[in-house]
Amino acid sequence: MKLHIVPARTGLAWVKSGIFVFRRQPLAMAALFFMTMAAMSMASMVPLVGPALALTLLPSATLAMMVASAEALQGRFPTPAVLLVAFRTGRQRLHHMLQLGALYAAGFLGIIALSSLLDGGLFAQVYLGGAPLTQETAENPDFQAAMWVAMALYLPLSLLFWHAPGLVHWHGVPPVKSLFFSIVACVRNIGAFTVYGLGWMAVFAIGGVLVSLLSGLLAVVGILPPGNVPGTMGGIMVGLAMVMATMFFSSIVFTFRDCFDPPEKPGTPEADNALPPPTEPGTD
């Protein structure tokens, strides 16, 4: 397994690839993303351990979307079976993915605990769904400080786990080592990941502007009564957010594909879900 250093413009290619693969199988990819989110939501409802259980499933859910994207790009229809890909490749892989999930849950909950030192747990209660976000809460300086600290700490956690599911699944890297290789790959390719992040920010911003323009246009021409604009706009925004989130998760496999060599052992369970071919040098 060799780490690849890619040019910054590759980040834009990753964004385009995520959108492209979604366009190839829009219904399948959207349905799979919805099912992963629904499974995590159901897990979060388990008394006492629900939030931690849902966080534990996130690396497996990310891997499922990576495999689904790879299959869609290769002309195969991604079925709901990919949702269980983390649990179908042998006992050792299963244990490693569960360990990875436990590490992620511990890291995330640790960040929330640290933020609670600043505001007495107010941000934690809002973020984990235990309290409503009111204007008074949002304007609370302690709440804002806790929010910014949590966001700052989540960035390195995200980099640690960005490539980890793929490394465990396709290369058989142990969980702790996968975290090290993941953050090294992200840091060494910081230019590409910066362009990648900015690209997705632009996509989300453009989507929001288009929804606003569409809602205003419908109201002006009389198709949509003015009183229904907020509700309709909110519904469209939710649907658009789901679509763009699906595109984003569909693009993750391309960041992994270009940063590491493909699996070295064809025919193994992890190699059966083959990665798409790498981005050609000079393409964007």
Task: Give residue spans per PLM region.
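Hydrophobic alpha-helical membrane segments
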Residues: M1-D284
